[in-house]
Amino acid sequence: MTNIQAFMKNFLGASPEWYKLAIVVFLIINPIVFFFISPFIAGWLLVAEFIFTLAMALKCYPLQPGGLLAIEAIIIGMTNAKHVKAEIMANFEVILLLIFMVAGIFFMKQLLLYVFTKLLVKIRSKIALSIAFCFSAAFLSAFLDALTVVAVIISVAMGFYGVYHKVASGNNLIDAVDISDDRKIIEQQHEILEKFRAFLRSLMMHAGVGTALGGVMTVVGEPQNLIIAEQAKWNFMEFFLRMAPVTIPVFICGLLTCFLVEKFKLFGYGEKLPDEVWKVLSDLDRTNSEKMSKQDKIKLGMQALIAIWLILGLAFHLAAVGLIGLSIIIFATSFTGVTDEHTIGKAFQESLPFTALLVVFFSVVAVIIDQKLFSPIIHFVLSAEENTQLALFYLFNGLLSSISDNVFVATVYINEAKAALTNGVIAPHQFELLSVAINTGTNLPSVATPNGQAAFLFLLTSSISPLIRLSYGRMVYMALPYTIVLSIIGLLAIEFILPAATIWLASLGLILPI
């Protein structure tokens, strides 16, 4: 092996050779285009390359390739470190949210696992169970991070799948076996296992869409919501009320879609939990409930009280979102007996890589601002009539968010809209409506692919996906009815309900104009 071969083997680790080569080519081309052709073209090239790294997240986590591209952009002068720092400081609350809120909810997983386990065992109707999962995921995602909600549901599904797989392969529940190996599955159990996989697939997708339905409603539902709220100066309640004319109709239609795809067994939905599996899981749940000690029950009670504090703290904006998250960590660890540094450290593993990636986003946003990359698009949209502007912002955001990361897209568009407001191009009232269009545009159509929703990408890359045969293509196919309904209802609500509803809410004194 030559030195170059050894270097390339280390470079970006286990990523495919063609992917490594593509990143190297990007790094070579960008300075050439910037210095000898056009900084504007080089800027757009960087944005396209960055979107490519997000779309290829399954090949390599975008932090490394995206980070290399961003560092090079700063070195060659597309932007500068001071501007990047300014963007980071302007969005510091989002960073606090990701670091502390996600970690805080980690210590409440026991309560969330308990709730979802009871739902799965107690509700026998598949339609009712699907709606319950979708609704519960939506409600939780309005107050918690969507990644955490999906992580909990994955834990429940993994646990149940593992239990039944062991039974179907003739093992005891305490045996350590590879649940991805189907070779020992008893012949007559194969069909039941396939039905169970289809059942779990549909539940995971309903819950995933539920996180999008709930996440769009509140400041803390998705990271980009907080970025938009910061620019528009909206607190928790005002953000909820501003979004409600769009999010409430979308939420109702989302639950209706859940009912219809289950009722008529469309797009891979409709498979019921086999009776044989339910009996095994029900027996296990009963055994676990009987084994629960007084100490365990007190832990659940404390976590429920902490959840109430979380909701009240957010609703009345008692502190910055990230600081409420920090208080959750302190309360949850203090009252459930978690005092070991290494155990506490595990809570931060989930959020810190994405936090680092978000800082890279802000570097690319700084390039977009310095090179005025979005100016032609923004001028085109803002030259349209006011009502048309809302639809165009929604559609452009939706299209980009379905192939890229919605935090990145929302950050870019809200910055451009704020600049237009500052320069007197749009009126404050129009900026408020555009902020709603940007938020709903990035959150709703982005369920189309795993690239757009971080929770979907997390599900796709989790260990449950290969077990239940949930591939990228199947996720896109199963998300399709939701994509169509959420996108169209969102657009209609933006166009026909939002302007009048905003004026009505303002007349009641429920929202305050800028």
Swiss-Prot record:
Example of a GO cellular component annotation carried by this entry: plasma membrane
Keyword annotations of the record: Antiport, Cell inner membrane, Cell membrane, Ion transport, Membrane, Sodium, Sodium transport, Transmembrane, Transmembrane helix, Transport
Residue ranges of the TM segments: 21-41, 43-63, 88-108, 143-163, 203-223, 239-259, 304-324, 349-369, 390-410, 448-468, 484-504
Membrane topology: Multi-pass membrane protein
Subcellular locations according to the entry: Cell inner membrane
Reaction catalyzed: 2 Na(+)(in) + 3 H(+)(out) = 2 Na(+)(out) + 3 H(+)(in)
Described purpose of this protein according to its UniProt entry: Na(+)/H(+) antiporter that extrudes sodium in exchange for external protons.
UniProt xrefs under NCBIfam families: NhaB, PRK09547.1
PANTHER family: NA(+)_H(+) ANTIPORTER NHAB (PTHR43302:SF1), TRANSPORTER ARSB-RELATED (PTHR43302)
Listed name of the protein: Na(+)/H(+) antiporter NhaB
Organism expressing this protein natively: Haemophilus influenzae (strain 86-028NP)
Gene: nhaB
